[in-house]
Amino acid sequence: MQAERGPAGNRCRMGVTVEKAERAGVETSHARRFRNFVGRSLVPKSPVLLSLRNYILLTPPVFALRFHLRRLYWRLTGHKLQQLVKGQGVESGFVAEKVLPYNLGNINIINRGRTERVIAILRSIRGLKLGALNTLVVGPRNEAELLLLSSYGFDPAKLTAIDLFSYSPAVRLMDMHELKFSDSSFDAVYSAFVITYSDDIPKAVAETIRVAKDGALVVFVYEHLALGAGNRFGKNNLSNGPDDLLALFGANAGHVFWKEDFESEGSYTSSVVFRLTKPKA
């Protein structure tokens, strides 16, 4: 017996297809309602609670052990400490002669508090999927910041870190004033306690804008002193806090998720999280 052909047969097949689609839609709707009921009424989910694995990895003894074992591993496998020098990766004498030696002296310090406070802000932004972001991390000093970011939701495979020195393959040698990346390469740029070491902040900002995508998440945190006091190297960069930094981004600074200038004992910690906007080509 042949299947019915012609307009009537087509209508029959279309009717079956529509019926199947409607049934699938009803089943999906029921499944969604059930998940919502379980997730909201029976076992409410937390949007910020860590997995048991990551909780254990972040406990102080375990985290410190991970950090030091990785440092030892890179040393034993022949990854020697490398650094940029003036004329070979760094053009600024100020950065090469003052900033680099100072930060090299602090290469073994783990600043968990500073990093985790910033991460807490990011994890509070509704709908932000940290693991999906191809992120540039500027100036981590060592692997601690990268371990923290990955333990709190960033995908380690999508983290690209740069600094003036490095003992790890996870951190590339590069100056934030001259980034070796193509335009619009990153979904996010994370720069914590780095920008005020610059003696040419507008250039560093311009490079950030260049390598970030339109709509990228931009995160800056830094310390500055009271107006006129000068910083550790005699400069007083961004003395008016996040407003000064946002002014440098100008029209490229879009929606601001977070902005703070916190004072403690005469020193200020500024933090700002915003969307980068770029003019349409």
Sequence positions of predicted segments:
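Conserved Class I S-adenosyl-L-methionine
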Residues: G230-F257
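A short glycine-rich, Lys/Arg-flanked "PGG" loop and its adjoining helix->strand segment in the class I
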Residues: P202-D214
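Class I SAM-dependent methyltransferase SAM/SAH-binding core
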Residues: N134-E178
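Class I SAM-dependent methyltransferase Rossmann-like catalytic core
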Residues: L65-L128
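A short acidic, Gly/Pro-enriched loop at the edge of an enzyme's catalytic core
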Residues: H177-V189
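Conserved beta-strand signature within the Rossmann-like core of class I S-adenosyl-L-methionine
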Residues: G215-H224
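Core SAM-dependent methyltransferase catalytic element
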Residues: F257-A281
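A short SAM/SAH-binding and catalytic strip from SAM-dependent methyltransferases
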Residues: A188-D200
